[in-house]
Regions:
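Gly/Pro/Ser/Thr-rich low-complexity, intrinsically disordered segments predominantly at protein N-termini
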Residues: 1-205
Length: 205
């Protein structure tokens, strides 16, 4: 189980202080003014993160749509919030929000892969912060199965559920032409080869 460590301070830490003081050698997030340092993730989490990151990044590169970052890129959303999403996408029209130390503003698309210790924040404080900041699309994916998995798109300033189609495929609303077959995610952790999945997506478009 992935565990969380909270770095307690007398006063809430600001995003500027977080970018200055956060450790460079491990993942850390600023949630409501508190620096949270998770323990190393489980293998099941990393396998899913690796598959989705490579698939999305390769698609975005082929289509020249923007840039994709992994779980060590901090995002300054608000004064007291600077999460490090598992996967994020910034469209080519908004690359100016990418700074030397991280992202300054809302990414277009965020994916969080749930764990027992992070799900509460992913569905709670971070969900609300992403929504307030204007993240246009938010996927919360449970590596153990579809039951806890949720997909959202921003409509009139609020996250609304975004459902897969009748065939079990989910199309992104921010990365045009990108979609996933949900069966790829829960097939005994035997993910299809990334190149094979990418070609399936490209051939369908």
């Amino acid at each position: 189980m992935q565990m969380l460590s909270r770095v307690e301070v007398m006063e809430r830490m600001t995003a500027a202080e977080f970018f200055r003081d956060a450790p460079e050698d491990r993942k850390a997030e600023l949630i409501d003014g508190v620096m949270i340092i998770p323990s190393p993730p489980l293998v099941i989490h990393e396998r899913m993160q690796n598959f989705l990151f490579r698939l999305l990044a390769d698609f975005v590169e082929v289509k020249q749509l923007g840039e994709v970052f992994g779980s060590r890129t901090a995002v300054e959303l608000e004064l007291f919030y600077a999460p490090e999403p598992d996967i994020l996408f910034v469209s080519k029209d908004r690359l100016y929000i990418i700074g030397e130390k991280g992202i300054r503003g809302a990414p277009d698309f965020v994916i969080e892969i749930l764990s027992a210790s992070t799900a509460q924040n992913d569905r709670g404080a971070k969900f609300r912060a992403y929504e307030r900041a204007g993240v246009r699309e938010y996927w919360l994916i449970d590596p153990y199965g579809p039951t806890g998995t949720e997909f959202y798109q921003l409509e009139e300033g609020r996250f609304r559920p975004h459902a897969p189609d009748a065939e079990g495929s989910l199309s992104s609303v921010t990365v045009l032409g990108f979609w996933i077959d949900l069966a790829w995610l829960w097939s005994g952790q035997e993910y299809p080869p990334v190149r094979q999945a990418l070609n399936t997506i490209l051939d369908a478009g």
